[in-house]
């Protein structure tokens, strides 16, 4: 119980600190979020028509990035074991 209360207090302190920093300079937050969206677009995370985790597939090309077609008989998209940079 003591550990749970400690974790809640640390999380609350983190949220309050982050909110205070956001109010101090919201343009930095907006630019950071825009950069993340651009990086996802460059990596092809939002590739149209790709199959997500556990989606049906016929080949690795059917799956979204970082996923590969696995299984025998009932093929599905699963993590291919790679990490992003």
Swiss-Prot record:
Residues 1-19 form the signal peptide. GO terms for molecular function: ion channel inhibitor activity; potassium channel regulator activity; sodium channel regulator activity; toxin activity. Disulfide bonds join 50-64, 57-69, 63-77. The keyword Protein biosynthesis does not apply. Residues 20-43 form a propeptide. InterPro entries: Huwentoxin-1. One of its GO terms (cellular component) is extracellular region. It is found in: Secreted. The presence of a 'disulfide through disulfide knot' structurally defines this protein as a knottin. Multimodal toxin that enhances nociceptor excitability mainly by the simultaneous stimulation of repetitive firing (through Nav1.8/SCN10A channel current enhancement) and impairment of repolarization (by inhibiting delayed rectifier current of Kv2.1/KCNB1), with a potential contribution from tetrodotoxin-sensitive voltage-gated sodium channels (Nav) modified excitability. Enhances Nav1.8/SCN10A currents (EC(50)=1.1 uM), modifies the channel gating by a right-shift in steady-state inactivation and delays open-state inactivation. This is Delta/kappa-theraphotoxin-Pm1a. It comes from Pelinobius muticus.
């Amino acid at each position: 119980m003591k550990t749970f209360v400690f974790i809640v207090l640390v999380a609350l302190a983190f949220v309050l600190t982050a909110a205070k920093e956001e109010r101090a300079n919201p343009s930095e937050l907006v630019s950071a979020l825009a950069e993340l969206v651009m990086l996802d677009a460059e990596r092809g995370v939002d590739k149209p028509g790709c199959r997500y985790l556990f989606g049906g597939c016929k080949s690795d090309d059917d799956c979204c990035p970082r996923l590969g077609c696995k299984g025998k008989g009932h093929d599905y998209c699963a993590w291919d074991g790679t990490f992003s940079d």
